[in-house]
């Protein structure tokens, strides 16, 4: 689960992290009052969307102006102008894809006199099964370029969960950033604060980009990006309250209501599979034969007929779907249950695109009989390779 920048800063504040003052707004009419709560004479007007690269992004609408999603205002009138232009407009960044995201919230923040910009993040490192820090002197909007062109400028280290954060971790951060004396002490303190917040709130990722050194000698988190482990949300009700469903894919929201693992992709072949490994293999073989998957959808091992029907409805709700592949290996999940769910869904929502069903495992003959006797135009496949070729050929033929 992701949250907005202003929410992330509110999460960090109780842990003592040094932050700039700011006010979030939902309406352009609130911009003047928000700016007057901050000292000025410079304000930063920031688009709040669940995507990075806002500063380099561009708005689709000409009425939003030529500047990006993060703008520097030198007067309250300019704050008001930017708010009027940006709210309701569609911001396109490298992370949003060409469709972009509508800006429904802005964060108006006091300006900072910046001396240096750094990069600091924490993440759950699968390789070490620990929380790892990623640190670089090359902060700001171009960290992706740094990672690609000069990876030696990025330093990482992990924290042993048995000991937790220790003073030497702070010293590593300070040394990497070239900080000494009082600034090294600030770096050590910040390292502890961020790690404590990361663990306490069950985060998956915490990115501070940039972490700045102000001209008056203070380390300050100028931006904050946060994501949380969805499996831990039951014990983080304050985090759940921050969820903004307008930033999420409507199909993914519907899938979560039925406990379906669904991720929207950009292809044309909808997939319904049981088991994450088989689902990944299904996506791969679709690509192998020249098409792209429209989604990842794992119905799980104990899906009911109703759950399968819901999954099918979610897939068919995607206008980009030109064909559907159902690939089931029945273990706990029974093939006849899948078959009944698919037939029920087809009868409910209709079938306007090719459908290929591959069943194998528990009650496979019963499942195939249900599909065969349904009278519906469903193609049956004997194995995964056969299924992938049939759906790809059917989609190309229908195009």
Swiss-Prot record:
What are its GO biological-process terms?
succinyl-CoA metabolic process; tricarboxylic acid cycle
Task: Please indicate if the UniProt record lists Flavoprotein as a keyword.
Answer: no
Cite the ATP-grasp domain residue spans from the record: 9-254
What is the enzyme's main class?
ligase
- Requisite cofactors: Mg(2+)
Please give the pathway this protein is involved in: Carbohydrate metabolism; tricarboxylic acid cycle; succinate from succinyl-CoA (ligase route): step 1/1
Which residues bind ATP per the record?
46, 53-55, 109, 112, 117
**Residues binding substrate:** 274, 331-333
What's in the keyword line of the UniProt record?
ATP-binding, Ligase, Magnesium, Metal-binding, Nucleotide-binding, Tricarboxylic acid cycle
Do you know which PROSITE patterns this protein is assigned to? ATP_GRASP (PS50975), SUCCINYL_COA_LIG_3 (PS01217)
Q: Which GO terms describe its cellular component?
A: cytosol; succinate-CoA ligase complex
Quick one: which residues bind Mg(2+)? 209, 223
Task: State how the cofactor is bound.
Answer: Binds 1 Mg(2+) ion per subunit.
Q: Which Pfam families match?
A: ATP-grasp_2 (PF08442), Ligase_CoA (PF00549)
The GO terms this record gives for MF are:
ATP binding; magnesium ion binding; succinate-CoA ligase (ADP-forming) activity; succinate-CoA ligase (GDP-forming) activity
**Catalytic activity as recorded in UniProt:** succinate + ATP + CoA = succinyl-CoA + ADP + phosphate; GTP + succinate + CoA = succinyl-CoA + GDP + phosphate
The EC number(s) given in the record are 6.2.1.5
The Swiss-Prot or TrEMBL record describes its family as follows:
Belongs to the succinate/malate CoA ligase beta subunit family.
Describe the function of this protein: Succinyl-CoA synthetase functions in the citric acid cycle (TCA), coupling the hydrolysis of succinyl-CoA to the synthesis of either ATP or GTP and thus represents the only step of substrate-level phosphorylation in the TCA. The beta subunit provides nucleotide specificity of the enzyme and binds the substrate succinate, while the binding sites for coenzyme A and phosphate are found in the alpha subunit.
Q: Subunit structure, briefly?
A: Heterotetramer of two alpha and two beta subunits.
What the entry lists under PANTHER family is as follows: SUCCINATE--COA LIGASE [GDP-FORMING] SUBUNIT BETA, MITOCHONDRIAL, SUCCINYL-COA SYNTHETASE BETA CHAIN
Protein name, per record = Succinate--CoA ligase [ADP-forming] subunit beta
Q: Write down the species.
A: Rhodopseudomonas palustris (strain BisA53)
Q: Which gene encodes it?
A: sucC
